[in-house]
């Protein structure tokens, strides 16, 4: 980022390669994702409209985009290292670029960084969640319960996490938040907050250990991906309740199994009881042809007699028919 700020020529080169259409799309708060396929076809996903064709881009322009991003990230991308991952220097959007031989022709995806905060009330108005579900989330925040937000790819986990964090700041403005991410996606307006980022040399587990010395009231993790899940559970369980994290899992109950898998990467001892004790609420959000919706919310009571004791607020068929978001 600093390198690019000091070299406006790189910015201009990237803008020229992207073209006016994609530069405008990156400024559009309704845009979720920009996708270029190896055949040169472009697709753009917009809130409320889904994915739609958006013209084409030449292989030369795509290769220039990927190369310019790699240059800005002080990385190399070529046939030996054909994949580049990082943040697009314009706007900090998430970028994934690929070159042959892993693809036939240059391809990339840009996940636009959300610039618009969607409050829980808007989720209710648009039918993404019910008033009862919003009330459950607010009650969990007020009670300093630990909340996991689960969902598949592009389901809206981070956007919902931002809404939950907004509620935390509103209800407990005195709390000090420490937020840990791999890529900058979390929005936090708290007066007392520390944002930490992983790097090539500092992983999430190391950041979590450092977090314990930063006197957090609440610990937020952008996405739990690996054995750092165990470190997070320990942090939440040692005087830092009321945290938020997202996890890649299609349902609320499968999020518990996913946590088991992740903690197993760091410990040979099963962590069922720890998970049952520390995780309080799991909110599952999904993307459907009709839009995103909170599929279910489960409250985790404990792990006993070989199973998790939970209370579930699952989307019923009647509510599913009414869903129009």
UniProtKB/Swiss-Prot annotation:
CDD domains: VirB11-like_ATPase. Pfam families: T2SSE (PF00437). GO terms for molecular function: ATP binding; ATP hydrolysis activity. ATP binds at residues 151-158. Keywords: ATP-binding, Conjugation, Cytoplasm, Nucleotide-binding, Plasmid, Transport. One of its GO terms (cellular component) is cytoplasm. This is Probable conjugal transfer protein TrbB.
